[in-house]
Amino acid sequence: MPIREDQVMASLVDFVLQACEGREFRILQLTDIQIIDPGQSRYPERINNITPISDEQLYADCFHYIKSTIEKAKPDLILMTGDNVYGEFDDSGASLRKLIAYMDSFQIPWAPVWGNHDNESTKGVAWQCEQFEKAQYCLFKRGNITG
């Protein structure tokens, strides 16, 4: 029995998104957010030599800009293209968990792409992948690609 094209495509696709009828599909790209928690820095003098910033203010500012941008763009999909969390400042994983919960709160599909700082947390890549895969609106599936 021949294999139909839609069966082949279904085996290659992890996620399918529906566009809103009557308007073009909108994708918002957020890049280099670099969420940090100065309280977790392995080298506290590095961040404090630049500027003394409170953890709460960093999150508030960053999340304010993310929310404002999402509200203006009204996207159907959000791509977060690298350096979402500065791993060296997130050895507990708290910043990544906050970011994931915040992104899920918009109830819009979103997908992270790894940057060169995302994998620096001592929690490790496998743990980070698990967090993304558990998120309700995150379109992430761990594969066998490394870089």
Predicted regions mapped to residue ranges:
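N-terminal active-site segment of His-dependent metallophosphoesterases
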Residues: 1-94
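Extended active-site neighborhood of metal-dependent phosphoesterases/phosphodiesterases
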Residues: 2-17, 96-147
